[in-house]
């Protein structure tokens, strides 16, 4: 039988600092419930399973690292670590994705933009883009195509345990992709300056 740890979903899981885009970086205290919910509700839609190969692209100081590690380990997927040199956008990243047969990755738009549009990454079946706004041009290149890839625009502040909304991108849609709908078991609220 499993030993009781005394932990509850309300207990602190980790503290991570925000980017400071609204002024000064601050420590976001994240509870177990947030990252567990993210993993529990996203493994299925992202088609993560034993045999999947998740790239650990984000620095440990960035919230996406928690997503990469948690989702890979809780789904039975392999988590692929690499040196910062091998993760450099462009030729090094292409080589890593190809040679390691990466099937799942969360990359910022700037990293995708550095990969030539004619690059074939046949093993990369699920690609999330986050950390900045995704453009229509990136969607046209990376969604579906000959490799039948799902491209998902992920959005959310650090305080939301990595991301709060997702949108599966349609390569035939016009304009930048929306931020999408809330992930399962969550709600979002659109507020004005008065709250």
How should these model regions be labeled?
Residues 1-195:
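Motif- and composition-driven signal specific to adenylation
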């Amino acid at each position: 039988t499993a030993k009781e740890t005394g932990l509850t979903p309300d207990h602190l899981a980790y503290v991570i600092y925000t980017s400071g885009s609204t002024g000064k970086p601050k420590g976001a205290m994240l509870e177990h419930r947030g990252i567990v919910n993210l993993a529990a509700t996203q493994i299925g839609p992202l088609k993560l399973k034993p045999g999947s190969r998740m790239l650990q692209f984000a620095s440990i100081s960035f919230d996406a690292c928690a997503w990469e590690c948690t989702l890979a380990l809780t789904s039975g997927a392999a988590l692929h670590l690499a040196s910062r040199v091998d993760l450099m956008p462009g030729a090094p990243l292409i080589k890593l994705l190809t040679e390691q047969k990466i099937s799942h990755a969360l990359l910022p738009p700037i990293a995708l933009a550095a990969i030539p549009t004619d690059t074939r990454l046949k093993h990369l079946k699920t690609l999330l883009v986050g950390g900045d706004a995704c453009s229509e041009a990136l969607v046209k290149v990376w969604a579906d195509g000959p490799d039948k890839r799902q491209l998902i625009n992920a959005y959310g502040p650090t305080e939301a345990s990595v991301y709060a909304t997702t949108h599966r991108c349609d390569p035939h849609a016009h304009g930048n992709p929306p931020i999408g709908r809330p992930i399962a078991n969550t709600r979002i609220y659109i507020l004005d300056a008065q709250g």
